[in-house]
Amino acid sequence: MFLTIKRAVCIRATLIFFSAAYVAATVPAASQESDAVVVKMTAERMFVPEKVSIKVGQTVEWANDDTTMTHEVTTDPNIASDPSDVSIPEGAQPFDSHLIPSGKTFRHQFTVPGLYRYACPPHENDGMLGGVTVAK
């Protein structure tokens, strides 16, 4: 019986050790992912939240939570239905996600401060517009 208790204690200690090691190994990766500001794209054809504020170097992640439609994020006036719906600050390059399937995401890191106005071209006429303000 003593050997059985000793074995149980050893197994429990081993499980605790490996559980702690697993958590320690995965926390930095989770922290890096959580640095992104998340904007959801909904079935109501909205960006939620519609406007976000971040600092230079931060990332915005657009997540398509809509189970029925693809969505897109663009600041490119050549892609937007109405070029006046999108804008970027001087020195920035336009970006476009292409169509984002349901359950997928698109990430963009902002390196130039200013106001970025973006649209979802397939639903732009429905008012699916948003903005990112990037501070120094």
Region spans (language model):
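Bacterial N-terminal signal peptides that target proteins for export
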Residues: 2-15
